[in-house]
Design a protein with these regions (language model features):
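Domain-level signal for soluble alpha/beta catalytic cores
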Residues: 1-219
Length: 219
């Protein structure tokens, strides 16, 4: 397989041939090959505007186990990327605290969450997050200084129209102070845990799986 950077550059060439000047690298789980491609774009079009956006779980990690804080910092320190962001995977309420923790990196921030979380209804995947919830959570980020807002999976023109209405109603505000990103602590497997003791002793244990909430609005 070709290195990721070469794949990105091959695709970029097709867009450059059509006169593209704005580029969005999105739903990324790592930075593999990204900066190689961005460097190529900047050499071809020095005033190109490039956004790099990562898909992050609510705990702040990508599916490859990389922390969004570290990825965003690498993009900022490269001096090549014009804006960094988060998109997909998480709903607005879960993405908002992650976005707030990235406001200190020194680049404009892009936030494009899913409408909510997917559910399967009659073999069809649907997102039950309501436009009002999506717009309300996104507008909070705008009030705190996020410059680029949008939507990913499950968002519709109705979601975007609701967001536009919320943004139009916002008064001018001062950006909030950035929140430091803390690294989740690893569990201490040595501590006294009744469940673990029973497993180690070969005793019968009972585990219950709970369905996820039916609505992504946890407020």
């Amino acid at each position: 397989a070709l290195p990721a950077g070469e794949v990105y550059i091959a695709v970029a060439k097709a867009f450059l041939a059509r006169g593209a000047k704005n580029f969005l690298f999105e739903t990324l789980s790592s930075d593999a090959g990204v900066l190689d491609a961005v460097s190529y774009l900047k050499k071809c079009v020095p005033d190109a505007f490039v956004i790099v956006s990562f898909a992050v779980l609510p705990d702040g990690y990508t599916r490859e186990g990389l922390l969004c804080r570290d990825l965003a910092r690498q993009m900022a320190e490269s001096g090549l990327v014009d804006a960094v962001g988060l998109n997909c995977v998480s709903a607005p309420g879960a993405m908002r605290p992650l976005a707030r923790q990235l406001m200190h990196i020194g680049l404009p921030l892009s936030v494009m969450p899913n409408a909510g979380y997917p559910v399967v209804a009659r073999t069809q995947v649907k997102y039950q997050g309501k436009p009002e919830y999506f717009a309300r959570e996104q507008a909070k980020l705008a009030a705190e200084g996020v410059k680029i807002l949008g939507g990913c999976c499950g968002t519709t023109p109705t979601h975007i129209a609701a967001l536009r209405a919320e943004l139009d109603a916002l008064p001018a505000q001062t950006a909030a102070e950035p929140v430091p990103l803390s690294t989740p602590e690893k569990p201490d497997v040595e501590k006294d845990d009744a469940f673990l003791r029973k497993l180690n002793a070969g005793e019968k244990v009972i585990a219950i799986e709970l369905d996820s909430p039916k609505d992504a609005d946890l407020t």
